[in-house]
Amino acid sequence: VECDTPILFAVASEIVIQKETSLATAETVSTSRTIKPADHPPLLAGDRGPMAMSRPGLHDTVLGILRPLPRGVILDCPAGEGALAERMLAAGFDVRCCDLYSELFRLDGVEIKRGDLSGILPYASQSFDYITSLDGLEHIDSPPQAFREYRRLLKPGGHLIISVPNIMNIEERFKWLLFGYTSHFKPLSEQSKAKIHYDCAGMDEIAVHANPIGYNELRYYLEKNGFAIQGVYRDRKKANQWLYWPIVALIRLLAKLTPQKRRADRWTDELASDPVLLGGNTIIIHSIQH
């Protein structure tokens, strides 16, 4: 269990510097957007725009999915600093944002509300044509509730793009076999938890991975809530996976030798596909609500 990327520690450091002075006097508007007077120190140290809190390549993949689709209203939750929202806005979409820590948001001109994916988000039913929810499900207490909210908030035929750490690629399977945990879901000692709490200025949820979710669980929750998968993607290829090719070949041979009905029942071909078995750190799923 760790912060996803170094930017999270950078953001947390800025918060530590400014938290007591800025949040004590910041004004909050009715949309839940935190703002500051002109003579007030920055809410976050440094005068810069939003930076991606996800791994490199993830936003590129999401934009590649969205660009061919009709323009519409998108909810980005969790939104982080607003880096993905900025790119979707530039692509012509009407973007709304939501995050458990809305004070992190840095994108001007876009609505930001505070909300928890484990609860009820502050929007009316069927408000959105699209929802992007990247690197959020693994951090929350109740992923099933998040899928119910996706269903409630999307219009019929709406698109959902989600991402989680890929715990089912060949490298992570080996780590689980050898150590009993994966790269993204390590055991946490009391000292580790205290360090995360300090480094992330008390906002533990942005760092702690609480729920490992594999492809099987994602597909189950999607189908249970009326979604049909349109595509499965990886954020990038991992350079060292060639070391596992003999095992990958064996897995795929065993898959081909499995009777067709059992392969279909157990999603064997999907679990042996490149995005899952040879995926990078993150798996991305695009689905449509029927």
How does the language model describe each region?
Residues H40, L44, R48-M53, G57, ...:
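S-adenosyl-L-methionine-dependent methyltransferase catalytic module, highlighting the catalytic core
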Residues I15-L69:
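Conserved class I S-adenosyl-L-methionine
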Residues D60-W176, I283-H290:
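Conserved SAM-binding loop
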